[in-house]
Amino acid sequence: MKKHFLSALAFSAVLLSSCGGTSKIEKPDACMQGGEITASSTIAVAETESGKVGGYVENGIYIYKGVPYAKAERFMPPVAADKWEGIRSSRAYGPTCPQGKRMGWYSDEQAFAFNWDDGYPDENCLRVNIWTPGVNDGKKRPVMVWLHGGGYAAGSGQELPSYDGTNLAKKGDVVVVTLNHRLNALGFLDLSAYGEKYLKSGNVGLLDLVAALQWLNKNIAAFGGDASNVTIFGQSGGGGKVSTLLATPSAAGLFHKAIVQSGSMLRTMEAKYSRRIGTATVEALGLEASRIDEIQKISYETLLAAGEKAIAKVRAEAEKEGVASFIFGWAPTVDGSVLPAQPFDPQAPAQSQNIPMMIGTTLHEFTMSTYVPSFRSISKEEAVEHLKKKYAGRTDDFLKAFEKAYPSYQPKDLIDVDFVFRPGAVEQAKLKAAQQGAPVYMYLFAWESPVLDGMFRSTHCMEIPFVFNNVVRHAGMTGGGAEAQALGEKMSSAWINFAKTGNPNADGLPAWEPFTAEKGATMFFNNTSEIKYNHDKNLLEVVRAFPTRGF
């Protein structure tokens, strides 16, 4: 009998410049959406434990980019950043973690909608970016720390226009933070088999996140933030990072609320598999144990290629052992130390019982019809034939449950509605609610973008511009129309309110009650938002009987 692990690592297998000036200039449209900027050696100066940083002011928001929060040697845990003299210029994004060729460039249409900014890579990438309404003013504002997506293999704190924190900081009087950390082989290659020196190598990317939170705890007051009111939120791989930090002992007390967007990670790598990937990587590099330190000097490109080869090898071995191979990739490992246990299996982490959570997904996530144009006009009969490939003799059960959950569905919904992220999100919410501690709130983002004839629907990442109140800034994805702007105002208010109080209820939205397994209250975000109760309970029961592998 095959052994299947419930894990949000499935999404890891699917996913993966600034302008400045001297004094009151207009930033070119190519760099941003416009607005007055003030930048000089005496403006926007804040003091950190490492030294002073100089940012700039845009539309009343103080902005700092590329501020070092730590430093690290390859495969080693992070340590305090070097101190500096004078004022460090912090007006441009710092380096991003080196990573493989972007997996997301499927088409010109996708490039247009997402409008990625990959920045420039360097292993010295441990940087934070900060947007705040005030510095050195004695105020204590809620802090919202965004963890980027891309699984644990790719991404950065600047990669999407949606990530810009100006509008969210200004609207909510909050401090917004994004950051970069080590990814892929640099952050999660487990070399613990080669001695104590490399004992934590498989989790240094996770330790980077902890180091960033520790830095914020010590320094955010200088940027007008309240270290005792920190919310971590992230999407896709970023949601997985949030899930994992909730179970990381060294992160306890460094944040107080958590939001998981399309990235509920219940399980992550087990040490026996991460070590196999590590040893297979070393073998692929042609190194022996006695020469392991040479791995420090091997080029990144060679290292990554060996790591990817090792992952493929271990996946193939796992298939023969009856283990679902899609769970293997770059990710934190349960090492008994940095991460003592699985994040949400068999239960929610006790250390985070009193941390309120929001959990949700988009209705379509990795929309099949986006990438297979013929599916956009698919008939019900054709859709059913695709369903039979997965659900076989239970296809009729699936159809009946689907019609109950989504009575106004179109034929393409049968293959577009997400069943990769939603089941894990519901399970995570149930586990959190079962703790009977702080509440958990559930949402489903169902708004569909009109861009490019609606080809993206409510795809993966679609909710991010709404959360950051960047619907106009990221109009290539949202269209930037009146309906999108109205929903963006409501959703960003909900996220701000949650960061401030742990309760997301906001004007313009129906009363939002906490999720329980019995009622399954879920906020459907759309032009007309509504609360639904266990709408897809029967449908998920059918879906869970089958491996999450798509069609």
Label the predicted regions.
Residues L16-S18:
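C-terminal motif of bacterial Sec signal peptides marking the signal peptidase cleavage site
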Residues F223-Q235:
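Alpha/beta-hydrolase fold nucleophile elbow
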Residues C125, L199-A221:
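Alpha/beta-hydrolase active-site loop
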Residues G149, V204-D208, S236-G239:
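Active-site loop->helix "elbow" adjoining a glycine-rich segment at hydrolase catalytic centers
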Residues V67, P423-F551:
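Mobile gating loops/cap/lid regions near enzyme active sites that modulate substrate access
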Residues F114, K218, A252, Q261-E382, ...:
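Substrate-access "cap/lid" subdomains that shape
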Residues G239-A251:
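Short glycine-enriched nucleophile-adjacent loop
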Residues G20-N203, A227, F326, M477-M491, ...:
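Non-catalytic accessory segments of hydrolases
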